[in-house]
Amino acid sequence: MASKAEKIVAGLGGIDNIDEIEGCITRLRTEVNDPALVNEAALKAAGAHGVVKMGTAIQVVIGTDADPIAAEIEDMM
């Protein structure tokens, strides 16, 4: 079974679509290459409480485990 981080990566359009990622208290702040590949429903199914899209900047609201999940995703990159 895929980890929460792997599901979030898939919702963000795959590891190759993620340009930058960092944890910020309760959010994952990301820059993606193609925002059209971001699947908000998949992110919510992975446990996101909300998704904020601003061009290529995507914020995934996931709660207090944002920092460890960001670190896990960075290790995949």
Curated annotation (Swiss-Prot):
Disulphide bridges: none
Gene3D superfamilies recorded: Glucose permease domain IIB (3.30.1360.60)
EC number: 2.7.1.193
Database matches in Pfam families: PTS_EIIB
Keyword Chaperone assigned: no
InterPro entries, sorted: Glu_permease_IIB (IPR036878), PTrfase_EIIB_Cys (IPR018113), PTS_Glucose_EIICBA (IPR050429), PTS_IIB_1 (IPR001996)
GO MF assignments: kinase activity; protein-N(pi)-phosphohistidine--N-acetyl-D-glucosamine phosphotransferase activity; protein-N(PI)-phosphohistidine-sugar phosphotransferase activity
GO biological process: phosphoenolpyruvate-dependent sugar phosphotransferase system
Active site per the UniProt annotation: C24
Segments forming domain PTS EIIB type-1: 2-77
Keyword terms of this UniProt record: Kinase, Phosphoprotein, Phosphotransferase system, Sugar transport, Transferase, Transport
Induction (UniProt): Induced by GlcNAc.
Catalytic activity: N(pros)-phospho-L-histidyl-[protein] + N-acetyl-D-glucosamine(out) = N-acetyl-D-glucosamine 6-phosphate(in) + L-histidyl-[protein]
Effect of loss of the gene: Mutant is insensitive to GlcNAc.
Purpose: The phosphoenolpyruvate-dependent sugar phosphotransferase system (sugar PTS), a major carbohydrate active transport system, catalyzes the phosphorylation of incoming sugar substrates concomitantly with their translocation across the cell membrane. This system is involved in N-acetylglucosamine (GlcNAc) transport.
Domain notes: The PTS EIIB type-1 domain is phosphorylated by phospho-EIIA on a cysteinyl residue. Then, it transfers the phosphoryl group to the sugar substrate concomitantly with the sugar uptake processed by the PTS EIIC type-1 domain.
The protein's name in its UniProt record: PTS system N-acetylglucosamine-specific EIIB component
Organism: Streptomyces coelicolor (strain ATCC BAA-471 / A3(2) / M145)
Gene: nagF
